[in-house]
A protein has these predicted regions:
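Generic alpha-helical secondary structure signal
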Residues: 23, 49, 136-144, 215, ...
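Hydrophobic helical membrane-anchoring modules
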Residues: 1-7, 114, 144, 149-152, ...
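Short, conserved alpha-helical segments within structured domains
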Residues: 75, 157-164, 178, 182
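Residues that recognize and position ribonucleotide moieties
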Residues: 84, 135, 162, 179-180, ...
Length: 242
């Protein structure tokens, strides 16, 4: 069910995921088809048939919207484009590689309904992650360092499946790779964050867009930047007009 009164906007950034977008769009519809929802796929400069495969689904899936970047801008920019275009007050995100299960989105919605006043619900894959042992170790170390330095209390910020307030997201500072630091950035705004266990699936089509070295060095630089942002931010300013 879709329409102008959208409850949930599902934002999916994709780049060269031609083989994944069709099954993923169908899974999103299966998970949310009885709700007022929309799904927004952002094609971030793909050079394969990602956009063409999505366009073929438009008549079958009226809730599907397709945005396209004219050149590759990165996952955070794609997510931000989708959130700005979203019509719903709540936004769910998924990675475009098919490893996040759209069937977990209703679980996050239930958590939202049971935890009024929480603005970000983070997926946590730790118990179900389907990656190599090295990838799991790499992620565990990165999450430990990040959590220790930022104090965000979130065990798995790299998980692509999230549900959050669109209003709060639009207040956040924009920078490349910001999607990896949403808990710290939401908390910077005074928002509450909780983690919810979700499933995780192996990648069966396509290839990862990230390597070990770019994750490592970019992560180190970005953690320093987020620490600076948190120190410099002053909240709670009340402006009164007499």
């Amino acid at each position: 069910m879709s329409g102008t009164n959208v409850e949930i906007s599902v934002v999916v950034p994709v780049c060269n995921e031609a083989d994944n977008v069709e099954p993923l769009a169908r899974e999103i519809h299966a998970a949310l088809g009885n709700r007022a929802y929309e799904m927004i796929f952002i094609d971030d400069g793909s050079t394969d048939d990602t956009a063409a495969n999505l366009r073929r689904l438009k008549n079958e899936l009226p809730a599907l919207r397709i945005l396209s970047h004219s050149f590759r801008s990165g996952q955070s920019a794609a997510v931000a484009s989708g959130v700005r275009a979203a019509r719903g007050p709540w936004v769910a995100t998924l990675d475009g590689d098919g490893q996040n299960d759209p069937a977990d989105i209703p679980k996050l919605i239930v958590a939202r309904d049971e935890n009024r006043g929480v603005q970000l619900f983070m997926g946590n894959r730790k118990a179900s992650r389907k990656d190599t042992a090295f990838r799991k170790l790499q992620s565990s170390i990165a999450n430990g360092v990040r959590s220790g330095l930022l104090g965000d209390g979130t065990p798995d910020t790299g998980c692509g499946i999230k549900l959050f307030s669109r209003e709060v997201f639009l207040e956040l500072p924009r920078f490349d790779h910001m999607h990896r630091f949403l808990p710290a950035l939401f908390m910077r705004q005074g928002a509450r964050v909780i983690s919810i266990p979700v499933s995780h699936r192996p990648r069966t089509r396509g290839s990862s867009k990230y390597g070990m070295l770019n994750r490592l060095w970019v992560g180190i630089i970005d953690i320093g930047g987020v620490m600076w942002l948190r120190r410099r931010y002053k909240s709670g300013l009340l402006v009164r007009e007499d």
